[in-house]
Amino acid sequence: MYKMQLLSCIALTLVLVANSAPITSSSTKETEQQMEQLLLDLQLLLNGVNNYENPQLSRMLTFKFYTPKKATEFTHLQCLAEELKNLEEVLGLPQSKNVHLTDTKELISNMNVTLLKLKGSETSYNCEYDDETATITEFLNKWITFCQSIFSTLT
């Protein structure tokens, strides 16, 4: 009788230990690669926006984006994911005129996939946004800084 309860207790303990185990090195390496890809995509977008040949930059700067009050953890990636649709719309404005932003849809799609891998499918995190909005360049710079910070803790 007690043997079955003891075995159940041991099984539950093993499940708890396995679920709370630290990330394996292969998972860490994969996370590093995903963060690096997200960082590169953000930098590519920023370079396209800041390109001196971008005739729509002044128009793009009128659009405002929300940024989290304090982005320091992976859960904050949900905030970036929520703003990607707006980012895609703003970047789509000059698409035919700016060679550097022609692959916007593909970049945003790649970022969505990468974000899903990094943050998982859970969307229960509610972002606390800063009271002040940011321009497109401020928005991209803030997320680039966030990715660099997270990436440095992983390496």
From Swiss-Prot:
Carbohydrate-modified residues: 24, 112
Taxonomic superkingdom: Eukaryota
GO cellular component terms, A-Z: extracellular space
PROSITE patterns attached to this UniProt entry: INTERLEUKIN_2
Organism of origin: Canis lupus familiaris
The family this protein is said to belong to: Belongs to the IL-2 family.
Any Pfam family hit: IL2
Disulphide bridges, residue numbers: 79-127
Gene Ontology terms: biological process: activated T cell proliferation; adaptive immune response; cell surface receptor signaling pathway via STAT; extrinsic apoptotic signaling pathway in absence of ligand; interleukin-2-mediated signaling pathway; leukocyte activation involved in immune response; negative regulation of B cell apoptotic process; negative regulation of inflammatory response
Record key words, sorted: Adaptive immunity, Cytokine, Disulfide bond, Glycoprotein, Growth factor, Immunity, Secreted, Signal
Signal peptide start and end residues: 1-20
Disulfide bond is among the record's keywords: yes
GO molecular function, one term: cytokine activity
Subcellular localization: Secreted
The gene coding this protein: IL2
Name the UniProt record assigns to this protein: Interleukin-2
Principal subcellular localization: secreted
Function according to Swiss-Prot or TrEMBL: Cytokine produced by activated CD4-positive helper T-cells and to a lesser extend activated CD8-positive T-cells and natural killer (NK) cells that plays pivotal roles in the immune response and tolerance. Binds to a receptor complex composed of either the high-affinity trimeric IL-2R (IL2RA/CD25, IL2RB/CD122 and IL2RG/CD132) or the low-affinity dimeric IL-2R (IL2RB and IL2RG). Interaction with the receptor leads to oligomerization and conformation changes in the IL-2R subunits resulting in downstream signaling starting with phosphorylation of JAK1 and JAK3.
